[in-house]
Amino acid sequence: MFKFVMICAVLGLAVANPPVPHSLGRSEDVHADVLSQSDDVRADGFDSSLHTSNGIEQAASGDAHGNIHGNFGWISPEGEHVEVKYVANENGYQPSGAWIPTPPPIPEAIARAVAWLESHPPAPEHPRHH
């Protein structure tokens, strides 16, 4: 009787566990076609762009100094167009867009404290001679 109960319990768990999808993306993403693509590499920089049938877009331009600016976007699972613009240069990668999270504003009391500290630098320390 114990074996019968255990077999029923294992079968019950197996049936109750929903199957895990193999891909978290949309099924049409697998079959997306490239609608347009261009790459122009020159001695003084490059230009690149890509557009696919499922709404993925990318464009970038770079110069001889290593500065790059561009954008990329896609259609979210909710059907909204997501776009990110960016600059990459000596100051690093700097993305911008409505979808980029932003930090909360600095509380006024903290801003006042920082301003006070900046306007009152500490006195230089003098080494003690023993």
From Swiss-Prot:
Gene Ontology cellular component annotations, sorted alphabetically: chitin-based extracellular matrix
Domain Chitin-binding type R&R: 43-104
Record keywords: Cuticle, Signal
Annotated disulfide bonds: none
GO terms for biological process, alphabetical: chitin-based cuticle development; larval chitin-based cuticle development
Region forming the signal peptide: 1-16
InterPro entries on file: CHIT_BIND_RR_consensus, Cuticle_Struct_Prot, Insect_cuticle
GO molecular function: structural constituent of chitin-based larval cuticle
Pfam families: Chitin_bind_4
Task of the protein: Component of the larval cuticle.
Protein name: Larval cuticle protein 1
Annotated organism of origin: Drosophila melanogaster (Fruit fly)
Lineage: Eukaryota, Metazoa, Ecdysozoa, Arthropoda, Hexapoda
Name of encoding gene: Lcp1
